[in-house]
From Swiss-Prot:
Keywords: Cytoplasm, DNA replication, DNA-directed DNA polymerase, Nucleotidyltransferase, Transferase. Its EC number is 2.7.7.7. It catalyses: DNA(n) + a 2'-deoxyribonucleoside 5'-triphosphate = DNA(n+1) + diphosphate. Belongs to the DNA polymerase type-C family. DnaE subfamily. It is found in: Cytoplasm. GO terms for molecular function: 3'-5' exonuclease activity; DNA-directed DNA polymerase activity. The lineage of its organism: Bacteria, Thermotogati, Thermotogota, Thermotogae, Thermotogales. The keyword Cytoplasm applies. This is DNA polymerase III subunit alpha. One of its GO terms (biological process) is DNA replication. One of its GO terms (cellular component) is cytoplasm. The gene is dnaE. DNA polymerase III contains a core (composed of alpha, epsilon and theta chains) that associates with a tau subunit. This core dimerizes to form the PolIII' complex. PolIII' associates with the gamma complex (composed of gamma, delta, delta', psi and chi chains) and with the beta chain to form the complete DNA polymerase III complex.
């Protein structure tokens, strides 16, 4: 009996894990087994693990009821060509009928139920078999041999004068650039990475020729002058004091990583164009069921199984592949065709192997990532930016960063106000600090108030006020203490991975170097380095992405209306983002109206200071329906819309009405709904009457509180402020959401969980009593505290003397403690949320 293993990558119920399989074979005294799937997804994993255990991996292909088996590498490559459709026949290779072999989908009896469960979720029968007790060794029968699956991957070859061309580019920049460039080129050449970097250069060059926007750079590659002069990156590494050794050094064995960001909607176009010049392959990836979804699936497929059985199935199945997919970024580019198993999608081959398999067999992928923000920027058709624009930095420093790359979150907005960046260096620092680790450790507070930072660090790293924020600073400190650039990068990585055996000799060398330089506090310096190194960020990446952040902020600061038009176009299906955009438009002084059936289209419409929401914010309204409506406009009634736009569902018309799209045609929304209800199809009424069904007209009574509830139902957010509330006394609802701040707001209840300040309206998570109240409102839509309101109510902030103040409502007061005395500022509030408060009178 010859076993034939089917892997989970056939997606037909197998739960075989290769490590367990290898141990089973050794226990049984076998030295080989056949793996034959309908694809080659598992081939590299199987090959690697079997050979690691000293076993012979016998590869096969399961096709048309037969098992084709490769005895050696030559036959394996023949199988791959047959699988790829490059040949239609395969000769001189062992072939078995399915019935001649024992298909193995599990390894021991405890896994059988898990295998049956997997068969069920793939819609297959319950016929599964395990590993037979007695079996023959297939390697002996077939005289099969062990072999690896490595391939000869060659990147395109650069022209012979490639180095000289780069040196010519550096000559006008001065001796510092020429010297560094030559050093970088020498390391790249010795490591054999010149073709790799040249290939990435060609990718970027082709993208730019196609008019595709490419990002300024990503990751440690931004620290390379070679990458900058090739046009791969757009950030001068010498200007920003970036280290090449962070990208590549003599000790590094694997190729460096150069990832390329391009506008997301053109990524496929670029890959197709690249395939005209090179051999291009996309990369497979595999989706797994999440813990929650797997448990739900087990409960629904096996409702009667015991808890013990369910837990056993869960343990057996968790982590197994559920479906194949295509890697979002990875692309293999080669000078020569590669003997890889592939499937084809949109004329581009996709290798069956995932990124880890490719790495194992010597194939290096390049990540080409589609970035939506680059498409957004491209739509402005602006290529040159002034990176010293005060208006842009002011916008960021206020935390007015909806739609600004990497700064939309509440923590990011708070950090914007704390750091208040005034230049690109400080903006880069802001991005580096905007991560959970640095924020938890208080690095942002230390940076903004750097009094307690040792003088040595303040002098050495003035740009970060002496605070260790970047990985490159750790390397600079190590190099200052006598380590080479290569040693400094090894130390950085060893600290990050907590590899003590690598760290300790380098730290000892650092200590000695610091003492030789007269640093008596060498121990303290090393202690600070170790404490902060785990929070340090890649400066090269931070500087590059700061350019994208700045560009989006600049466009918002100088082209507000166009910015919001595009923001709505890119986010029309995200009600939460549209709600925030509405708040910010109101904060900018615009009157925001519901979608209008005769004015609105698929984009935001500006008429002076009046703004009309797109029809596409209404649920169920897509671009096709909008185009139909635009063709028949003007529309004079609900009835006309139904008569002239064929097939528009009644519930969509109702959503348009409750969203306010017919407000200019009817005195109120109740009347529009009444007309809709009168238009119930006559033939449906007649059919129902024929069968004696009682037909009732739907009620169209709308109370004042229902308006916002119905808007929320039809658009995902409430819009219309239906009550008047005194204004100008405190902050506004739109202040809270525009700046992402916790602020005092005067509100009136609209319905159970909806409030208005007379200018805006929002849902809150707290039930507010009837009447007007002062509330402390959070941008998370929580009311932190409620106070009854009268005309004498004042909200008093208490801050220390370092706080920056801004204009506020007339009933807001800030008390600043200066030299032991309290100074009061009426009509002002602190710019940051670090304040104590009280309300008077209560």
């Amino acid at each position: 009996m010859i076993p034939w293993v089917i892997s989970p990558y056939s997606f037909d119920g197998s739960v075989v894990r290769f490590e367990k399989l290898a141990l089973l074979l050794k226990r049984k005294g076998l030295k080989s087994v056949i793996l034959a799937d309908r694809n080659f997804h598992a081939a590299v994993k199987f090959n690697t693990i079997m050979r690691k255990h000293g076993l012979i991996p016998v590869h096969g292909l399961w096709k048309d009821g037969r098992i084709f088996v490769a005895r050696n590498r030559e036959e394996f490559d023949s199988l791959v060509r047959y699988y790829n459709g490059e040949t239609h026949e395969i000769e001189d290779i062992p072939v078995f009928q399915e019935s001649e072999l024992t298909p193995v989908r599990y390894l021991d009896a405890s896994e059988k139920k898990a295998s049956i469960f997997m068969r069920k979720i793939f819609g297959l029968d319950e016929d599964v078999q395990g590993f037979p007790e007695k079996c023959e060794d297939v390697a002996d029968i077939l005289n099969a041999e062990a072999y690896d699956l490595r391939v000869n991957h060659r990147f395109p070859t650069p022209p012979k004068n490639w180095n000289e061309l780069l040196i010519k580019k550096a000559e006008p920049l001065g001796e510092e650039y020429i010297s560094r460039l030559k050093r970088e080129l020498e390391v790249i050449k010795r490591k054999g990475f010149t073709p790799y970097i040249y290939t990435v250069e060609k990718v970027v060059e082709i993208a730019k020729k196609m008019g595709i926007k490419v990002g300024p750079g990503r990751g440690s590659a931004v620290g390379s002058l070679v990458a900058y002069l090739c046009g791969i990156t757009e950030v001068d590494p010498i200007k920003y004091d970036l280290l090449f050794e962070r990208f590549l050094n003599e000790e590094r064995q694997e190729p460096p990583d150069i990832d390329v960001d391009v506008e997301d909607r053109r990524r496929k176009d670029l890959i197709k164009e690249l395939s005209k010049s090179f051999q291009v392959y996309q990369v497979s990836t595999f989706g797994n069921l999440t813990e929650k979804s797997l448990k739900n699936l087990i409960n629904s497929v096996l409702p009667d199984a015991s808890l013990e059985e369910k837990n056993e199935i869960y343990k057996t199945v968790y982590g197994l592949p559920h479906h194949p997919s295509v890697h979002a970024a990875g692309v293999v580019i080669s000078e020569n065709p590669l003997p890889l198993p592939t499937r084809t999608e949109e004329d581009i081959p996709i290798t069956d192997y995932d990124m880890y398999d490719l790495q194992e067999i010597g194939v290096v992928k390049i990540d080409i990532l589609g970035l939506k923000t680059l498409s957004f920027i491209k739509d402005f058709k602006k290529e040159i930016f002034d990176y010293s624009d005060e208006k842009t930095y002011h916008l960021i420093s206020k935390g007015k960063t909806l739609g600004v790359f990497q700064l939309e979150g509440l923590q990011a907005r708070k950090l914007c106000r704390r750091i208040s960046p005034r230049n690109m260096d400080e903006l880069s620092i802001l991005l580096a600090l905007n991560r959970p680790g640095p924020l938890r450790s208080g690095l942002d507070v230390m940076f903004s108030n750097s009094k307690n930072v040792p003088a040595f660090f303040r002098k050495m790293f003035p740009e970060t006020r002496g605070v260790l924020i970047y990985q490159e600073q750790i390397m600079r400190l190590a190099m200052f203490a006598g380590l080479s650039g290569t040693e400094a990068d090894i130390l950085r990585r060893a600290i990050a991975k907590k590899e003590r055996e690598k760290m300790e000799p380098l730290l000892e060398k650092m200590k000695k170097g610091l003492l030789e330089k007269g640093m008596e506090n060498a121990e303290q310096i090393l202690e600070i380095l170790l404490n902060f190194s785990s929070y340090a960020f890649n400066k090269s990446h931070s500087v590059a992405y700061a350019h994208i952040t700045y560009q989006t902020a600049y466009l918002k600061a100088h082209h507000l209306e166009e910015f919001f038009k595009l923001y709505f176009a890119y986010n029309s299906s995200d009600a939460g983002k549209i709600f925030l955009a509405v708040q910010e438009l109101r904060n900018e002084g615009y009157r925001v109206h519901p979608p209008d059936i005769n004015i609105s289209g698929k984009d935001l419409v500006f008429h002076g200071k009046d703004v009309y929401l797109p029809l596409t914010v209404v649920k169920g309204v897509g671009v096709t329906l909008v185009e139909q409506i635009e063709k028949i406009r003007p529309v004079s009634s609900v009835r006309e819309l139904q008569e002239r736009v064929t097939g528009v569902p009644r519930n969509v018309v109702e959503s348009l009405i409750t969203a306010g799209a017919f407000d200019k045609l009817y005195e109120n929304r109740k009347l529009a709904l009444e007309e809709l209800n009168k238009r119930v199809e006559k033939d449906i009424l007649e059919i129902r009457s024929l069968f004696g069904e009682k037909v009732e007209q739907e009620s169209s009574n709308i109370k004042i509180g229902d308006i916002t509830e119905l808007e929320e139902k039809s658009m995902g957010f409430p819009l219309t402020p239906v009550h008047e509330v005194p204004t100008g006394l405190f902050a506004r609802i739109d202040d809270v959401f525009t700046y992402g701040r916790i602020l005092p707001v005067l509100v009136k209840r609209v319905s159970r969980n909806i409030v208005t300040d007379g200018l805006s309206v929002c849902r809150v998570r707290t039930d507010v009593p009837d009447g007007v109240h002062l509330v402390l409102l959070s941008p998370l839509q929580k009311i932190i505290k409620i106070w009854p309101f009268n005309e004498n109510t004042r909200f008093v902030y208490r801050v220390d003397f370092t706080a920056t103040l801004e204009k506020a409502g007339q009933n807001e007061i800030t008390e600043v403690l200066k030299n032991g005395a309290v100074v009061r500022y009426e009509g002002y509030r602190p710019l940051t949320d670090e304040y104590r408060y009280r309300v008077v009178p209560r």
